[in-house]
Amino acid sequence: MAVLSNDQVDAALPNLPGWERAAGALRRSVKFPTFLDGIDAVRRVAEFAEEKDHHPDIDIRWRTVTFALVTHAAGGITEKDVQMAEEINRILSD
């Protein structure tokens, strides 16, 4: 899978509310009402990621969860990461 150019990532970001490009990855931080709400969101994202065999890096800091997406095997952000960001947004809105 090809790494997206900076222009391609910039074009995708307006369609990915809450996401930004940082440190070579797509990143989104979400503050949940409670710690357990954050853990539940991580579980739902993890189940989908397992199904797709594309796993975000996930950082949990009390009620704030940060998701980071980069295709390590390709060495950068790919269309697979953009699609996963869209799905994470869908999962979090449920």
Curated annotation (Swiss-Prot):
First-tier enzyme category under EC: lyase
UniProt organism field: Mycolicibacterium smegmatis (strain ATCC 700084 / mc(2)155)
Reaction catalysis annotation: (4aS,6R)-4a-hydroxy-L-erythro-5,6,7,8-tetrahydrobiopterin = (6R)-L-erythro-6,7-dihydrobiopterin + H2O
PANTHER family reported in the protein's UniProt record: PTERIN-4-ALPHA-CARBINOLAMINE DEHYDRATASE (PTHR12599:SF0)
One Pfam assignment: Pterin_4a
Any one GO biological process: tetrahydrobiopterin biosynthetic process
Key word Lyase present: yes
Coiled coil residues, start to end: none
CDD domains: PCD_DCoH
Enzyme Commission number, as recorded: 4.2.1.96
Domain of life: Bacteria
The protein, known as: Putative pterin-4-alpha-carbinolamine dehydratase
Entry keyword set: Lyase
